[in-house]
UniProtKB/Swiss-Prot annotation:
EC number, UniProt record: 3.6.1.-
Residue numbers binding GTP: N132, K133, S134, D135, G186, P187, S188, G189, A190, G191, K192, S193, T194
Organism per entry: Variovorax paradoxus (strain S110)
Listed GO MF terms: GTP binding; GTPase activity; metal ion binding; rRNA binding
Similarity comment: family membership: Belongs to the TRAFAC class YlqF/YawG GTPase family. RsgA subfamily.
Function text: One of several proteins that assist in the late maturation steps of the functional core of the 30S ribosomal subunit. Helps release RbfA from mature subunits. May play a role in the assembly of ribosomal proteins into the subunit. Circularly permuted GTPase that catalyzes slow GTP hydrolysis, GTPase activity is stimulated by the 30S ribosomal subunit.
Gene3D superfamilies for the chain: Nucleic acid-binding proteins, P-loop containing nucleotide triphosphate hydrolases, Probable gtpase engc, domain 3
UniProt subcellular location: Cytoplasm
GO cellular component: cytoplasm
The name this protein goes by in its record: Small ribosomal subunit biogenesis GTPase RsgA
Chief localisation class: cytoplasm
UniProt entry keywords in alphabetical sequence: Cytoplasm, GTP-binding, Hydrolase, Metal-binding, Nucleotide-binding, Ribosome biogenesis, RNA-binding, rRNA-binding, Zinc
Length: 318
């Protein structure tokens, strides 16, 4: 694999009218590291102030002396967002899977998990939940039981013990990920670095090379990086450090129920067509929420998360 930023890609210095195909594998600010179909890499800059390419974008770029200009972003299959207190920003595109890695310890946030699943559902990306640290018997059992609503929603939950049974976990993961582009997400302490290095030996060194090529200094928590798992470049991982709040502001409040499978299953049973599932009489969702003395298929925690997100999305529009 070519060293990033060391070898100019073929076509550099040729006619400016020629456009070349490329894949964005990393970005920092307005600098993108683009890989050509032959595996060479070069720095490119998007054309125009508002133009922005993200990791996973297929682009068409124009050569200059030693860098390039991204002239076109090929239409995306999907786009993933993150948000902070100030804004929502896209950060990865053209994904087949989102692998959400959580652990038996420390205890994971079901709210963050729900946000990630909703973001994936909105873009029609297949989510995979992986629960690490299966060697910790009691914490793992608690976490596994906590995930029961997600298993009922047909979200596969893959048990892992990355430090205790890495070889077996490698085989299990590759059965799911082979031939796909997968965004890997997870909170601190879940074992995401261990997973990345299991599937991509030397990923730490590659990250350093990419950071150097982009002049971004030390690898930061906001950088997103594409790694090839195999030499044939058919299987890839996209690592986005941290477990940020996923941007949901592009989703209208009334769309939310349709993006939560357990809620959606009962949303058509409501008396009113425009039911918010929060307070209306004859609501099919409310009637199916689990409660003391009245078991139901929708967990009380999931319904609470729905209400919180509905309020958040309603507020963001004013």
């Amino acid at each position: 694999m070519a060293k990033p930023g060391r070898t100019p890609a073929k076509g550099a210095g040729t006619s400016a009218r020629i456009l070349h195909d490329g894949l964005v594998i990393a970005s920092h600010g307005r600098h993108c590291l683009v890989e050509t179909p032959t595996g060479e890499r070069l720095i490119c800059h998007p054309r125009g102030k508002k133009s922005q390419a993200v990791v996973g974008d297929r682009v068409r770029w124009q050569a200059s002396e030693d860098e390039g200009t991204i002239e076109e972003v090929v239409p995306r299959r999907n786009l993933f967002y993150r948000q902070d207190e100030i804004r929502t920003k896209s950060f990865a595109a053209n994904l087949d899977h989102v692998l959400i890695l959580i652990a038996a310890e420390p205890e994971f946030s079901e709210h963050q998990l729900a946000r990630a699943l909703i973001a994936a559902e909105a873009e029609r990306i297949t989510p995979i939940i992986a629960l690490n640290k299966s060697d910790l018997a009691e914490p793992f059992e608690r976490a596994w039981n906590k995930l029961a609503p997600y298993r009922r929603m047909h979200h596969g939950v893959l048990p892992l013990s990355l430090k205790a049974s890495g070889e077996a976990d490698y085989a299990s993961l590759m059965k799911l990920l082979a031939g796909k582009s997968t965004l890997v997400l997870g909170p601190s302490g879940a074992g995401k670095s261990t997973l990345i290095n299991l599937l991509v030996p030397g990923a730490t060194a590659l990250t350093g090379e990419i950071s150097q090529a982009l002049n971004s200094g030390k690898h930061t928590t906001t950088s997103t990086t594409w790694y090839w798992v195999d030499e044939a470049r058919t299987t890839s991982l996209i690592d986005s450090p941290g477990f940020q709040e996923f941007g949901l502001n592009h989703i209208a409040p009334m769309q939310l129920a349709g993006l939560m499978p357990d809620i959606a299953e009962h949303a058509n049973d409501c008396k009113f067509y425009n039911c918010t599932h929060l307070h209306e009489p004859g609501c099919g969702v409310i009637a199916n929420v689990d409660a003391p003395g009245k078991p139901g298929p929708i967990s009380a925690t999931r319904y609470r998360i729905y209400g919180e997100l509905f309020a958040e999305l309603s507020q963001s529009r004013y």
